[in-house]
Amino acid sequence: MTELKNDRYLRALLKEPVDCTPVWMMRQAGRYLPEYKATRAQAGDFMSLCKNAELASEVTLQPLRRFPLDAAILFSDILTIPDAMGLGLRFSTGEGPIFDNPITCKADVEKIGVPDPEGELQYVMNAVRQIRKDLNGDVPLIGFSGSPWTLATYMVEGGSSKAFTKIKKMMYAEPQTLHLLLDKLADSVIEYLNAQIKAGAQSVMVFDTWGGVLTPRDYNLFSLQYMHKIVDGLIRENDGRRVPVTLFTKNGGMWLEQIAATGCDAVGLDWTINIADAKARVGDKVALQGNMDPSMLYASHDRIREEVASILEGFGHGGTGHVFNLGHGIHLDVPPENAGVFVEAVHELSKPYHQ
């Protein structure tokens, strides 16, 4: 594989010295960029874009042409696994993802198998291979998956949810059915992420978007234990380099110690936690990724720089191990120039912390 020209992101995840704090943005390839909208229109619809390796690579690289980002993230969706399990995924305008065949009972869970990453999900691996080729070693490529709990919420609810009543009903009335589903999903995620690593992903991230809706006990039982299983099952070295893994639970600030104890390399933070507190709690064990509120990108350029400075100061001088990011995905109507101000501010204002 091509030599990596910028490995700042990988080094920070492994708490190795860097010249400045690396930065990337969740959903950096997306609807806030006019060029993304043009490519998506060319593809026809969202899943067609995901399934076309050349176009998926094009949208992955678009933000890198605009901003000096330190990593690229695979353009895909967390729902590729349940889609490959035959749940009939479609995207409805204004409603988000819908599954025509949701999971409603134990028999539904027993019917589904672990998808073959080089079979039903080969289009994802083709995209990874294409992106690595097109990146030409400029920056590392991040692969990703949803967490078992988060995938299960969509599969049982039949789409997005605000109250999570269907999955919580299953969790409390039929816990064994839900555990069976989560176990299959954990096995699927392990195979899926390992295939991404073999195809060229140099780091992987697990998005636990909905872990924060659980009680502390249920978080450990129904979300964290399955992410722990994934961390244990991942390829951690490839191409002569460590493959770092980041776990991110949105609204997971109360569980940082438990997340750090899984053996992951980094913990993603949302904006509801102070990064100085997070560092004091788990900074000796793991790197931290985050954690500016994505809505801050609506602010003036000066205010964005001020917020970046404040988060950098919060992480402080004590060693490396910070990957700057937003606390969740960038909003679709953020002015692209504000994202540029953010990225450049991170590089410029972080240099004194790394001397």
Curated annotation (Swiss-Prot):
Pathway: Porphyrin-containing compound metabolism; protoporphyrin-IX biosynthesis; coproporphyrinogen-III from 5-aminolevulinate: step 4/4
Annotated site residue numbers, Transition state stabilizer: D77
Species lineage: Bacteria, Pseudomonadati, Pseudomonadota, Gammaproteobacteria, Vibrionales
Keyword field contains Cytoplasm: yes
Gene designation per UniProt: hemE
Broad enzyme group: lyase
SUPFAM superfamilies for the chain: UROD/MetE-like (SSF51726)
GO cellular component, one term: cytosol
Keyword Zinc: no
Protein name, UniProt field: Uroporphyrinogen decarboxylase
Superkingdom assignment: Bacteria
GO molecular function: uroporphyrinogen decarboxylase activity
Self-association and partners: Homodimer.
Protein family: Belongs to the uroporphyrinogen decarboxylase family.
Subcellular location: Cytoplasm
Gene3D superfamilies recorded: 3.20.20.210
GO-annotated biological processes: protoporphyrinogen IX biosynthetic process from glutamate
Annotated function: Catalyzes the decarboxylation of four acetate groups of uroporphyrinogen-III to yield coproporphyrinogen-III.
Principal subcellular localization: cytoplasm
